[in-house]
UniProtKB/Swiss-Prot annotation:
Residues 494-497 are annotated as: G4. The keyword Oxidoreductase does not apply. GO terms for cellular component: cytosol. Belongs to the TRAFAC class translation factor GTPase superfamily. Classic translation factor GTPase family. IF-2 subfamily. This is Translation initiation factor IF-2. Residues 135-159, 184-289 are annotated as: Disordered. GO terms for molecular function: GTP binding; GTPase activity; guanosine tetraphosphate binding; translation initiation factor activity. The lineage of its organism: Bacteria, Pseudomonadati, Pseudomonadota, Gammaproteobacteria, Alteromonadales.
Amino acid sequence: MADTTVEKLATEVGKSVERLIEQFSQAGIKKGHTDNVSEAEKQQLLDYLKKQHGGDNAPTKMTLQRKTVSTLSVAGNGGQSKDVKVEVRKTRTFVKRDANDAVLKAEEEAKAKAEAEAKAKAEAEAKAKAEAEVKAKAEAEAKAKAEAEAKAKAKAAAEVKVIKELSPEAEAARVEAERLKAVQAEATKRKQDEEAAKAAEKARLLAEENSKRWAEEERQRLEAERYSDHHITTSKVARAAEDSSDMDEEKRGRRARNKNTAKSKRGGKDARDGREKHMRNRSTAPESMAHGFNKPVAAVNRDVRIGETVTVAELAHLMAVKATEIIKQMMKMGSMVTINQVLDQETAQLVAEEMGHKVVLIRENELEQQVLSERDEEGVVKLEPRAPVVTIMGHVDHGKTSLLDYIRRAKVAAGEAGGITQHIGAYHVETDNGMITFLDTPGHAAFTAMRARGAKATDIVVLVVAADDGVMPQTIEAIQHAKAGNVPLIVAVNKMDKPEADIDRVKSELAQHGVMSEDWGGDNMFAFVSAKTGAGVDDLLEGILLQAEVLELKAVRDGMAAGVVIESQLDKGRGPVATILVQEGTLRQGDIVLCGLEYGKIRAMKDENGRSITEAGPSIPVEILGLSGVPSAGDEATVVRDERKAREVALYRQGKFRDVKLARQQKSKLENMFANMTEGEVKELNIVLKADVQGSLEAITDSLMGLSTDEVKVNIIARGVGALTETDATLAAASNAIMVGFNVRADAQARKTIESESVDLRYYSVIYNLIDEVKAAMTGMLSPEFKQQIIGLAEVRDVFKSPKLGAIAGCMVTEGTIKRSAPIRVLRDNVVIFEGELESLRRFKDDVNEVRNGMECGIGVKNYNDVRVGDQIEVFETVEVARTL
């Protein structure tokens, strides 16, 4: 085929000339519009395009599997037939040859063809040569035969001539001799022909037999390759699967063995013959009954892929060993486990490496990462300025909520129980210079986790310090949270309207903890305010906005929202309610939210004042309804696209949380197993705790768990958000627990159960009272403490002998009162030499119960006669002392 131009080739393939020239260039060929294209260049371009479009990546091998199930009817016990299923699995592999293989195959075929032609040519030449030799030999034989016939004729003519001259008797004898000679030659020739025919027939039969045998062997080999993975393991099924000839042979062998056994009982030669035949029969047993497995002699080291949690059974499957081997190994390592025990990743890694395997640690949150990666915003990300998130922190009763209340111009502090904040309040305030979002955190010591969460989600921390009170423990803790979160700190010195205000004291105390005023050369801004009169509040807001400008706070406004859960609760009428601080994007009603272990579609949104809204931008706190459950405070809230995938991720997180929790608990149990054995009996105070919001529940739980001692342990057997239910009451009755409700009440069914079971139910609205009463209950459970108190002291002045009581000490009571029923100690030179009890106490001759200070008496000490003058007798009693925590 003649070369064609680039333009003509572009017209043929239906592409533009520029695109074709570009593809030639990518393939390494430089061409112009009018250049010619050879066949080799076309092939080069075609190979390049195939490689680019995945031609080389196509699979070269395909394996097909087919499974057939058949039923065999075999004879069972008692002559009954039994159906056995036989499963046959067939595997066939097709291999696709690539271009190089095709070329090599073509070359091999050409070479084989040339060899076959050469061989055929050589065979033809040999055949022609053989035919020529046969023809020459035949001609020579014909010539010799003709000469012989000519000689015979000449001889016959001569003989005839002679015969004519002979007598008639001689002629008859000659004819008879010739006849006999011809008969003998004919018989010899017939015998040779018969022998040749027999030899040819024998060779033909042998060739046919060999051909059949070779074909049968080839067929058996192919069948063996096709069914190499199929084994019949049951002996009855194996016999049923054998062909009839093998079964007949086995039956004949069995009958022969039975006969030999009968003969062997007679002993002698029959026994020896029987044993020999038995051995021969055993040697001819079918090989299909032999076991085909040999135990591996070398250890196999595998790459074991371990997730975050794994059970003992799953780990055994990964390492291809029995679960008992892992249990033995862990017993050697000092741990008692069961086959369904959940192991954490670290423990499983130690076990696998101890058994000689290589461990590959994997993370199982691929679906989670995929769902979160799919929410990336489309197009160009546009950052816009956002409002600062300010957290108000400080010690309890230093005026945090009052200051924020003045800023919001609403009475919030009066509505808080006890006048203190017990959960995070999120508000946003519009000022003349812009919007500010405030997070009001509790100041009580119990709310450490809530304050830490507030510092994590914030941009600026405002530390409120009372001018008359100074730096307190929670003030120091707030400073530590701000430093840990690397958050700018602004100090608001409150209660400046009080006459006891001391600014210099506050500055010096804060300086001891690394908070230096700008006046003293530090970096922290100080604002002196009064939440009561409002003095200095404008300066504080101006300082907050100035600090926000320095930080250059920006966020994506358009796109899918993400934020953090500030607070969560279970509302009886609305269900799970979560307060979310939006950090980026816009949260809209109807979005699908993945929130920690929970998920759901937003059914309603409300701002901090309870008004319904449809969307919320960055730095806006909002309440959402529609989650599947109450999320934990501090969880990240993310909007995703697919609700089904969100549910899968939430379920995966729940399962992982449960497995990790169980593994951690089990690890703790194993580590503390021997320590627990040595501990004595520990009393437990069981509590069923319900609170109004998640943050308060966390704070109360941490505070109560911190009250536990070596003798009394606080055990919170159930906790949750929402009202006290009948289930809670039943659980409390069964576990002998007290029910505690913090800003929640029991429903009607729960109250009936509480009355019928006489459960101790207590309501609280201030955390101080709750902790104090639980502490009092724990104090009542403490084991009593006993103390010995001296009630009297007598000095021995003389010793008398009594036939009944032995030595009687004549004493003078110098201190307190001597009582007959009390135990005593005998002191000599202020050293205790005997401890016992009084046997008799007399004044003059009368028995008395007690003798007071300054009186004389006679004292008989039981089982002690070594009383001397100058000894002291000390009388004491054991009193119970109430213990406190």
